[in-house]
Amino acid sequence: MKLTQPLADVYCKEQKTALEAQRLAQEISFAPMVFQVSRLMVKFGILEYLSNNHKGVTQTEIVEYTKLSNYAVQVLLEASLSIGTVITSDDKFFISKAGWFLLNDPMAKAN
């Protein structure tokens, strides 16, 4: 493949450290789980509920709102914390910036 020099500088040699490459490989391998959890957080209205409650909500409040089991909500919240779409403080959960964009960005919604 013939590449212009700026593209060759990027695509013809390794750009990542071993640690960065390992992190990327893990992100790729977890992508289906990240997608499914995020999709369910939108489908069940949890991200929207968090977005509308700026003072945060407890896990119990989310269970009451969604009518999902406590375990289901716990799994979704814990995964969302790792994904980065939710943050927590003082036993309350809040939507993160990434969660807000997932909920509101037209391109994120389309994909």
Q: Which residue stretches match the model-derived regions?
A:
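N-terminal accessory segments
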Residues: 1-111
